[in-house]
């Protein structure tokens, strides 16, 4: 579990990509479902090992990936922005980005049409009927894909091991309003050019 990793004070865990590295000519792209650290944090390690294939993701996810790559001193190249509903054709594969709710902007599921069937990758998601950006998980599109038939579903969801449901991000914002609504904020700075808060 991730908590065990933190207890050992390990800052970064990078998976063994030997097989991928030995077969990099077969890799046609890296597809990012969202911008959380556990999904893009290793891109600066993985990407050059695989010969810098095209990275596909939403604008926000790619901005985070771009920062990771720049931070490691590598030149940024081969990035393609996509939006929910877009389909990317890569060789014999079609990859559709589908809007899902998560605790970060522009999260996506992926529907990958292959010659032998559809692989559905949920990415991290939650069903949130009141998301702060008012963009709901595209349950209609997910249902359409399901009706056509899915060969394999790769599902993940933060806190899946807990009973019940996860509260809406909107609830978190409302809680902050209650907690901090009557607080007095005071800041000071000795700098002469302080404009103000």
Language-model features: locations:
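Positively charged, low-complexity/disordered segments
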Residues: 1-2, 189-192, 196-197
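His/Asp/Glu-rich metal-coordinating catalytic cores
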Residues: 3-31, 36-188
